[in-house]
Amino acid sequence: MPQIGDDAISRDGKVLILAMDHGLEHGPVDFEPVPETIDPSTVFDVATHDAVTAMAVQKGVAERYYPSYEDDVALLAKLNGTSNLWMGEPYSPKNWTVDYAAELGAEAVGYTVYSGSNHEPEMYEDFREIQENARAHGMPVVMWSYPRGQGVKNDTKDDVIAYGSRIALELGADVAKVKYPGSKEAMEWAVDAAGNTKVVMSGGSKVDDLSFLRSVEAVMEAGGAGLAVGRNVWQREEPERILDALEKVIYEGAGAEEALD
C-alpha cells in the first residue's frame, strides 16, 4: 500500500494539491477574476512552484497539457466530475479509468464521493473499483469526501465533516479532502476520525490572504496534512506570493501573519 508521506504527491508527509477541475464543476465563470487562467497552461505554470506537491485535473486537460509539464508537476488524475448544470441529487460520474490515468503518467488519483446522496451506492461501488485498481498500480487515492444530498441536512456541521473523513478511512482512501469546519477544535475531530488517513482542507471560495492562511494554520495545528486548493491560489493576481506563504505555514510551521511578512 502506498505510504503517503513518502510518495510523489507529498513533501515531508505534507500535501498541497493545486486543483483545477473547476472548468467542469463550475464552468468558465471561475476564470473571470484572472482571465488568463482560462488557459490551463497558466495554472500548470503556477503548479511548478516548489510548495505544490500535485496538480488535480480532469482527463481532457491532462491529455492536452500534462505532457509539457510531466518533468515539473506531479499529476493527480481527478477521475470523476459533473457540471454545474446538473440539477438532480448530488452525483459525480466516473469519466476515466485508473489504467488510462497511469498511461498518462498520473502519480495519484482522486475521486469525489457524496455520502448521503441517493446515488451513494453507485459512487461507493465506483470508488471501490478505483481504489483497488489504484492499489494495483501503487498509486495513492485522494477522496473528495463531501456528505450531501437528501440524507444530509447541513453539510458544514462538525460531525458531518468528521463523518466524511471517517468514510474516507473506511473505504480505503489515503487522503481525505474535506471542508474546513470553521475551527481548530472541529478540525481535530475530523483528523481523529480519519485515523491514519491523511486529512486535507478544501480551499473553497477565494477569501483575503490573512483569513485564508489563518484557516490553513488551524488545519496544520489540528494535525491536518495540508490542503487541496484552487481558487484561493490561481484567482489571485500574484499566485506565487500566496504559495510562498503556504509553503511557510504547511512545511515550516509558520503562523499566518509571519508567513505574509
Predicted segments — roles?
Residues 25, 234-235:
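Generic, ordered loop/turn and secondary-structure boundary motif
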Residues 206:
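A C-terminal functional module that forms or caps the active site or interfaces directly
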Residues 201-203, 229:
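Thr-Gly-centered strand-to-loop micro-motif
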Residues 10, 15-55, 60-84, 89-199, ...:
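Alpha/beta enzyme core
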Residues 1-13, 234, 240-261:
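N-terminal charge/polar-biased segments
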Residues 29, 238-239:
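Short capping/connector residues at structural and topological boundaries
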